Regions:
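Short glycine/acidic-rich loop motifs that flank beta-strands on beta-rich extracellular proteins
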Residues: 25, 31, 48-51, 71-78, ...
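Extracellular beta-strand solenoid repeats
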Residues: 9-11, 20, 53, 61, ...
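Right-handed parallel beta-helix
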Residues: 7, 14-16, 58-69, 91, ...
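Short flexible/disordered coil segments
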Residues: 82-94, 98-104, 194-196, 239-240, ...
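C-terminal extensions
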Residues: 115, 137-148, 160
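Short, well-ordered amphipathic alpha-helices
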Residues: 1, 105-106, 121-122, 142-145
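Right-handed parallel beta-helix/beta-spiral solenoid domain characteristic of secreted/periplasmic
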Residues: 2-98, 122-134
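Hydrophobic alpha-helical hairpins/lids featuring a short glycine-rich hinge
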Residues: 109-113
Length: 244
């Protein structure tokens, strides 16, 4: 963790190409919301491969990196085949229910209460071959979640206060392009009308999604969730839901 006046910074320096974090299915961690989700069909726990994982981290600024998490075995398996055979096999592979959940950047709040000032800026995230079905697992380009704490009474409700995702290019990812905020507290936000106090206690505040470009996401493009008046401006989402 950083501090308000002393942020942790992870970024490129010097000249030349951006540093490239290439996960290729490594960086595996176990995600568990600790509670079933809003649909019994939605997966709520399992292994996830993330190129970058920020777990209970705050006061952190990550910028100017290239990030990928490819399924190279799938790509190599269709080499040399006819276009029809290749298309058929690719379709079968991307829709396989057992396909690994993958993320470019995963951010997780769980055992540290409210997390503050997390900034992702000028990241080039592409070729993240995740599972198109597991929509609320950390699955896609950038995905931030809040999981049930081990001891909520002691550590507090897991939530975010101050998230900025800005100037990022995200392409060829699945399932999500950019998602901020799916939470184990989802049941508290099921009504048609919600009080501001619920967001201040159980949801997220000061969420900014600005100047991002998402192209060819397998599912959703850019989504804030359970956030009080998030600022979403000057983003472009192009050719999304390509695997739906």
């Amino acid at each position: 963790k950083g501090e308000k006046e002393n942020l942790i910074e992870i970024a490129a320096y010097g000249e030349g190409a951006l540093p490239h974090i290439c996960a290729n299915g490594t960086g595996i961690w176990y995600q568990d919301y600790g509670i079933r989700l809003d649909s019994p069909a939605h997966v709520y726990r399992g292994d996830v491969s993330s190129a970058v994982l920020l777990y209970d981290a705050e006061y952190i600024w990550i910028h100017d990196l290239e990030i990928t998490n490819k399924d190279d075995i799938d790509r190599q398996s269709v080499a040399g085949k006819t276009s029809g055979e290749a298309r058929s096999e690719i379709a079968e592979r991307y829709s396989a229910p057992h396909k690994m959940d993958r993320t470019g950047v995963s951010v997780v709040a769980q055992n540290s209460g409210t997390l503050h000032e997390i900034t992702l800026q000028s990241l080039m995230i592409h070729d993240v071959d995740g599972n198109v079905y597991n929509k609320h697992m950390n699955n896609g380009g950038i995905y931030m979640t809040a999981l049930k704490p081990d001891n909520e009474e002691q550590t507090g409700i897991a939530r975010y206060h101050g998230v900025t995702v800005e100037d990022c290019c995200v392409w060829n990812v699945s399932r999500w392009g950019i998602a901020v905020g799916y939470s184990y507290q989802h049941a508290r936000f099921a009504g048609a009308q919600l009080q501001e106090e619920w967001f201040l206690k159980y949801g997220h505040e000061n969420i900014v999604l600005r100047n991002n470009y998402v192209k060819n996401a397998g599912g959703d493009g850019i989504t804030p969730m359970y956030a009080l008046r998030p600022l979403v401006e000057h983003n472009i989402s192009d050719s999304c839901a390509t695997e739906m």
